[in-house]
Swiss-Prot record:
Protein task: Transcription factor that acts redundantly with NAC20 to regulate the expression of genes involved in the biosynthesis of starch and storage proteins in grain. Directly binds to the promoters of starch synthase 1 (SS1), pullulanase (PUL), glutelin A1 (GLUA1), glutelins B4 and B5 (GLUB4 and GLUB5), alpha-globulin and 16 kDa prolamin, and activates their expression.
GO cellular component, one term: nucleus
Biased composition (Pro residues): 147-157
GO BP, one annotated term: positive regulation of DNA-templated transcription
Localization terms from the record: Nucleus
Description of how the protein assembles with itself and partners: Forms homodimers. Forms heterodimers with NAC20. Forms heterodimers with NAC23.
Tissue-level expression: Expressed in developing seeds. Expressed in developing endosperm.
Region feature Disordered, mapped onto this chain: 143-162
Designated gene of the protein: NAC26
InterPro entries to which the protein is assigned, alphabetical: NAC-dom, NAC_dom_sf
Organism annotation: Oryza sativa subsp. japonica (Rice)
Protein name (database record): NAC domain-containing protein 26
């Protein structure tokens, strides 16, 4: 309870809604550089001092001056691994911090190098077989043009060098709010159109015009008979013989007993086809009788006859038959 009260007392008096979230350039310019110049006198309400080698990362949020944020800032001094060496000790009791990637250069006004940022990840266990965690640290330090020098002996009264101080930002990667992944709505399979048939909106009118221009217009004389005419034809053929005769040539006109009706350029057969063949057989029989009686009958030039020619042929056949009967009667007597 007493520790929580101390944490509340350490909180800076800021209006609601204010957050401490400086940029990399602001951290170097306004917080790290003044601390290096006056390490004892310079103090910031939002950044506390901590020894990272004696604290585990999950304990650091409780030691921050601004509690309740998703990232925490600390001043820390580098702990040399060896008194006369250059390597930094980054181990704790539970694990160690391991650098990852290259250091990032920080510029002022995009041309003046003022600092460097190093990214480290905390591993549980001992190197090199530690288990990686989601705790991440950004370590900010001033840029030094001169090569690094080993620290002075502990007996010296010389103040700490500028590369001994750093600003560390600690955060946990899983604590950030991730944006939900929006899955695009897909059309059902039966509603999807193949890619080959999808027409862009810009070319739709042009393609429709080309398609309409490519449609072949069927003339009236080439159109098929209507459904009612086809049914009538089937009805007429069904009343005739079971074996329907082959259709006559297209040049046929109207014949006795088997007229042809022209309707919109389509030829339709009307009547009983057997009547046409019976009449043809009768005409052939009459011609044979006339040839046997001594009459010379020439073969018709064409099977296509008009109604008037067919009537004349019938009258001629009747007259010839009467003449044959009269001749037979004369010769009989």
């Amino acid at each position: 309870m007493g520790e929580q009260q101390q944490q509340v007392e350490r909180q800076p008096d800021l209006p609601p809604g204010f957050r401490f979230h400086p940029t990399d350039e602001e951290i170097i310019t306004f917080y790290l550089a003044p601390k290096v110049v006056d390490s004892r006198g310079f103090c910031v309400a939002a950044i506390g001092e901590v020894d990272l080698n004696k604290c585990e990362p999950w304990d650091l949020p409780g030691k921050a001056k601004m509690n309740g944020e998703k990232e925490w800032y600390f001043y820390c001094q580098k702990d040399r691994k060896y008194p006369t060496g250059m390597r930094t000790n980054r181990a704790t009791e539970a694990g160690y911090w391991k650098a990852t990637g290259k250091d990032k250069e920080i510029f002022r006004n995009h041309h003046m190098l003022i600092g460097m940022k190093k990214t480290l990840v905390f591993y549980k266990g001992r190197a090199p077989k530690g288990d990686k965690t989601n705790w991440v640290m950004h370590e900010y330090r001033l840029a030094d043009a001169s090569p690094p020098q080993p620290p002075p002996p502990p007996s010296s009264a010389e103040p700490p060098r500028q590369d001994d101080w750093a600003v560390c930002r600690i955060f946990h990667k899983s604590s950030g709010i991730k944006k939900p992944v929006q899955v695009p709505m897909q059309m059902p399979m039966q509603m999807q159109m193949p890619v080959a048939h999808q027409v862009p909106a810009a070319n739709y009118q042009q393609q429709m015009a080309m398609a309409s221009a490519s449609i072949i217009q069927v003339p009236m004389q080439m159109q098929m008979p209507s459904m009612s005419d086809q049914l009538q034809m089937l009805d007429d053929f069904s009343t005739g013989s079971l074996m329907a005769p082959p259709p006559p040539p297209p040049s046929y006109s109207t014949l006795p007993g088997f007229p042809l009706q022209i309707n919109g350029g389509a030829q339709q057969f009307v009547g009983n086809p057997s009547m046409y063949y019976q009449q043809q057989q009768q005409q052939q029989q009459q011609q044979m009788d006339m040839a046997a009686g001594g009459f010379v009958v020439s073969e018709p030039s064409s099977l296509v006859v008009s109604p008037q020619d067919a009537a004349d042929q019938n009258n001629a056949a009747d007259i010839s038959s009467v003449a044959c009967n009269m001749d037979a009667t004369i010769w009989k007597y």
